[in-house]
């Protein structure tokens, strides 16, 4: 069973949408498990303080290393990878999602305010992970993105395992266009090759479409694809 731990100030956010549909069914069937930790509970003062002002001045507040470290130490699993969700981190991609799906468990720390005391990251061997070049108000939304990208790769979660292999990024390319009934809609017809029944021609068409779309929309991916 694949396991995830979420360290957050808002435990009621979870499991949220991950308790619905295929992921909810997989959770019930114990394909994966989720533990949610409110790290505010590690604070011992009357006000349960988890943040403070940064040394050297500056705007905003920082999460305190001592509070988060205590929460992590009380809950971490042996050998698991711990990620702090941050725009400074390594960017999540399909390759990393697949890598994480092969772990036994991961922990995700949902940040708030202006960030976290840097000493926490170095002393607890925490990796920083980003979902993109933009800023969110908190790490919870990013945690959902990470979990969504990983859970669908776990064996037994998707109804059609083959569908994982046909999607964007699986072969280094963006996904080809797809069509369903009706065959003609608003005077636009489905491409004839998809109606031919010739699987080799369909495969070639889909590859050429994926290549063309990737070349125009994601030249960075296209360059990597050409090198491989």
From Swiss-Prot:
Which residues take part in binding S-adenosyl-L-methionine? 111, 131-136
Any one Gene Ontology molecular-function term assigned to this protein's record: tRNA (guanine(37)-N1)-methyltransferase activity
Catalytic activity from the UniProt record: guanosine(37) in tRNA + S-adenosyl-L-methionine = N(1)-methylguanosine(37) in tRNA + S-adenosyl-L-homocysteine + H(+)
Example of a GO cellular component annotation carried by this entry: cytosol
Reported EC number(s) for this entry are 2.1.1.228
Q: What Gene3D superfamilies does the record tag this protein with?
A: 3.40.1280.10, tRNA(m1g37)methyltransferase, domain 2
> NCBIfam families from the entry?
PRK00026.1, trmD
Q: What is this protein called?
A: tRNA (guanine-N(1)-)-methyltransferase
Organism annotation: Pelagibacter ubique (strain HTCC1062)
